[in-house]
A protein has these predicted regions:
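Active-site loop segments of alpha/beta catalytic cores
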Residues: 2-227
């Protein structure tokens, strides 16, 4: 299949990584994958996919159901190849209204997790509904995830009060600070560690690393975290 190289890569990494380094598999969540399938590219307003989702929810739901099935298979094969945890990225979750977020983001993730846990009951699963604000709390309480990855706009004190009692939180350095480096980056790293480090926490960026990030800044980040 076209994704066979993914499983091969996961398997090779699993063989080479030391025992104290976890290998995390990942997939796009159904809503976000659907946005790219329908729009054909990234979109500022997601007008085309929203027209379908809001105007013909039964028809759009059939696409989401197909993506749920495909995602369960995709993540399951990554686990079989050696992934020790998985993460679902819903990059465009924040584009939806509250009710649409429930229907097109939370419910499909719930279905994926239910099906994965039949075969992998102890598999750690992280969700990333980027940009949903207070919706992170609903997601953490209802989606069935073990961890929630946070974008860089989420207030840290709110995270401690509203999320860390329910799930492990992951995040949330602004990727642009990793590009900039220096004192600004290091101050924010320390603030995140000091605020979130008292509870269940995985340090990470608040979204993906950007191409122009200097490798030495990544090295400095790793040095701080290991120190």
């Amino acid at each position: 299949t076209k994704v066979a190289p993914v499983y091969e890569t996961v398997g090779r990494l699993a063989e080479e990584l030391p025992d104290n380094v976890a290998l995390i598999g990942f997939a796009g969540a159904p809503w976000t994958v659907a946005t790219y399938m329908v729009e054909g590219r990234g979109s500022r307003d997601h007008a085309i996919v929203k027209q379908w989702a809001y105007g013909d929810p039964d028809g759009f739901g059939q696409l989401i159901d197909l993506l749920v099935t495909a995602t369960v298979e995709y993540l399951g094969k990554q686990v079989e190849a050696g992934a020790e945890a998985v993460q679902l990225f819903d990059t465009w979750a924040g584009a939806l209204s509250e009710t649409a977020f429930q229907r097109w983001c939370i419910e499909p993730v719930q279905q994926i997790i239910t099906q994965l846990r039949r075969n992998y009951p102890d598999l750690p699963i992280i969700g990333f509904p980027r940009g949903v604000g207070a919706g992170y709390k609903t997601f953490a309480k209802t989606a069935g995830v073990n961890g929630v990855s946070l974008d860089w706009t989420v207030p840290l004190d709110w995270t401690v009060a509203e999320l860390q009692g329910d799930v492990t939180v992951q995040g949330n350095l602004d990727p642009r600070l990793l590009v900039i480096g220096g004192a600004a980056m290091e101050a924010e790293i320390q603030r995140i560690l000091e605020t979130l480090g008292k509870g269940p926490f995985i340090f990470n960026l608040g979204h993906g690393i950007v191409p122009e990030t200097p490798p030495e800044h990544v090295g400095r980040l790793a040095e701080i975290l290991r120190g």
